[in-house]
Amino acid sequence: MNYAFGFILIYLTGSALATKQPSMTATTLARVVEEGMKKQCKEEEKHSEFAMFFARLWRSQFIAFVGNVIMAFAVALLLVWGAERLWGMNIVAHSWDKLLTDASPIHSKLILHAAIAGVFLFISGIIAGNVSNKQKHNQFAYRIEEHPILKRALGVKRTKKLAAWLDHKRPGILSNFWFGVFMGSTASIGTFFDLDLDIRHITFVSGNIAMGLYGAAFHLVWSMWIWIFVGLVIVGFINFIVSFGLSLWVAFRSRNIPDSEIFALIKAVWRH
């Protein structure tokens, strides 16, 4: 629940969770590909719009990565520093080694755990799309607007505002709620079944690194510095590529776009 309400709070405050956007934009990208396939032009120009769209998506994700890493690192560092000032003890003095080891791709199953988080990002995108489609089909906003009790209690104008807000925000709220449930319960399920299951998301990893460094008083061998940096980059890339790849694959299947078109898309992105 802590994860779920945390993600909902991020969403409602207008902030962005890194790697969440790609799974939500795959349908738009698939539409762009479909339109490109219909163009009567040179082969190398068919997917120029996709390449530009993908480049914008990648740039926005890079900014989200940097923003999430800086914010999570700073907040985590501030919390452990504040805890030491308040209680007079370093609360991560005995756990810093595990926190940093978990961020290393050669000392832990970081890649697998990052891929699991990517799958959950993909599923949360599916949930958001499904809720949005159901709302449109069931005329969700109209039903809220015409609810007699709400109209009497809030008035017509406020009820319409509430309906519009719920229609816009509800898919994201439910999506983030379930994303939090998936992320927060994975390690517990793994422990119950005696499986090495866990999640790694770039935001959490950067926070763990901050706490681990504070616990170690920032005294690490140079190789560990390198590996935790490499691990952070790998986690972000795996989160992105798994969630985006799965979402794009589903979107392609729904529009009957052949798998052979992927090579043409890669070439277009490379040229761009």
List each language-model region with its residue ranges.
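Short membrane-interface loop/juxtamembrane segments of multi-pass integral membrane proteins
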Residues: 32-59, 99, 151-168
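Transmembrane alpha-helical segments and their cytosolic interface motifs
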Residues: 1, 56-78, 111-114, 168-189, ...
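Long, highly hydrophobic alpha-helical transmembrane signal-anchor segments
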Residues: 1-4, 84-119
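Hydrophobic alpha-helical membrane-embedded segments
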Residues: 1-24, 115-135, 182-188, 236-249
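Interhelical loop segments of eukaryotic multi-pass membrane proteins
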Residues: 20-32, 90-94, 137-144, 199-205
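Core alpha-helical transmembrane segments of integral membrane proteins
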Residues: 1-41, 60-84, 120
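Long, compositionally biased intrinsically disordered regions
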Residues: 136-272
